């Protein structure tokens, strides 16, 4: 559904494109609201597993995707800054489930209607 949004960067001092191909893929936290919406819309339209990705940097981000309908999530860009990001996301989800007494993560999938 979404990998990146096409973006452009201009070097104002050289008055030229800062990216060799003029445009490039913008990913990470900037695309998360779009990605969450797309997961939600897909989950409403089909009954197949959906992997939520795009801007997940912590457990709260991952939980947004799960509540929107993702059956799994993927951590991408955050791994560049923190090689433990995926582990921390998983631990954060476990903490959330304990805090809110959720026994089965499937109870969270698509819980936002």
Give residue ranges: language-model regions.
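Short, well-ordered coil/turn segments that N-cap beta-strands
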Residues: 46-50, 70-71
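Glycine/Thr-rich beta-alpha phosphate-binding loop at enzyme active sites
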Residues: 1-44, 48
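Glycine-rich phosphate-binding active-site loops on the catalytic face of alpha/beta enzymes
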Residues: 1-8, 55-56, 60-88
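C-terminal helical cap(s) of enzyme catalytic domains, especially alpha/beta-barrels
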Residues: 10-24, 66, 78-103
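A short, charged, Gly/Pro-tolerant segment at domain boundaries
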Residues: 107-113
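Glycine-rich beta-to-alpha transition loops that act as phosphate-gripper elements at the mouths
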Residues: 32, 48-60
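Contiguous, function-dense segments enriched for cysteine-driven chemistry
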Residues: 38, 77, 107
């Amino acid at each position: 559904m979404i990998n990146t949004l096409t973006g452009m960067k201009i070097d104002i001092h050289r008055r030229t494109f800062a990216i060799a191909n003029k445009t490039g893929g913008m990913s990470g936290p900037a695309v998360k609201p779009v990605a969450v919406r797309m997961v939600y819309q897909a989950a409403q339209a089909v009954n197949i597993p959906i992997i939520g990705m795009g801007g997940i940097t912590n457990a709260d981000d991952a939980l947004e995707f799960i509540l929107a309908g993702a059956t799994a999530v993927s951590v991408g860009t955050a791994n560049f800054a923190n090689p433990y990001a995926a582990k921390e996301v998983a631990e954060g989800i476990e903490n959330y489930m304990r805090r809110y007494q959720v026994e089965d993560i499937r109870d969270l999938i698509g819980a936002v209607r």
